[in-house]
A protein has these predicted regions:
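Short catalytic/metal-binding and nucleic-acid-binding patches
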Residues: 1-167
């Protein structure tokens, strides 16, 4: 690995760069028709998505991507500081989809909340879902996130979720 730039070092000059993150992004594969679980986190884990307006912006953008044949949206949950969504790619690559989603929602959320600055962390996590049985488990994992965080007793009580199938 090459020398870290000054901005990638702490005060003592030690590298703070996450090793391998660039190579992981480089090796990212986008397969049309492949279901993915995608997780994206708000910058500095700030609770920007804890209201109907901000969550509605993200939900609206996900549904727009679905309605415009960019993704087949299967499920999502919008947590106060991150989102999980499950979708299959229809057109474009995963990085293109994520760029569209983050760029649009950042501008709208900043305008709505009358704020400036970053909304999303640059990175996101994607996991290709291999089998149909796994897909059901991943949907349950995704939708039950608010339950695990003790925000609600049942995911149906949480206001910011969607699933195209009955679970």
């Amino acid at each position: 690995m090459g020398a870290a730039s000054r901005r990638d070092c702490d005060l003592a000059g030690n590298s703070t760069k996450i090793r391998g993150s660039k190579s992981l992004r480089k090796g990212r594969v986008s397969i049309k028709g492949q279901p993915y679980l995608i997780t994206s986190t708000i910058h500095e884990r700030e609770d920007l998505l804890n209201d109907a307006q901000s969550s509605g912006i993200v939900a609206g953008a996900l549904h727009w991507l679905h309605e415009n044949n960019r993704i087949d949206l299967i499920a999502y949950v919008i947590m106060p500081d991150h989102i999980h969504f499950i979708a299959t790619l229809k057109s474009g690559t995963l990085p293109e989809i994520m760029h569209s989603l983050k760029s649009y929602t950042s501008k709208k959320i900043n305008k709505t909340l009358k704020r400036e600055g970053g909304v999303w962390q640059e990175q996101y996590h994607d996991h290709a879902i291999r089998k149909e049985e796994d897909l059901k488990e991943v949907i349950h994992y995704c939708l039950n996130n608010p339950v695990r965080k003790k925000l609600v007793k049942s995911y149906q009580d949480y206001p910011y979720w969607y699933c195209k199938w009955e679970v």
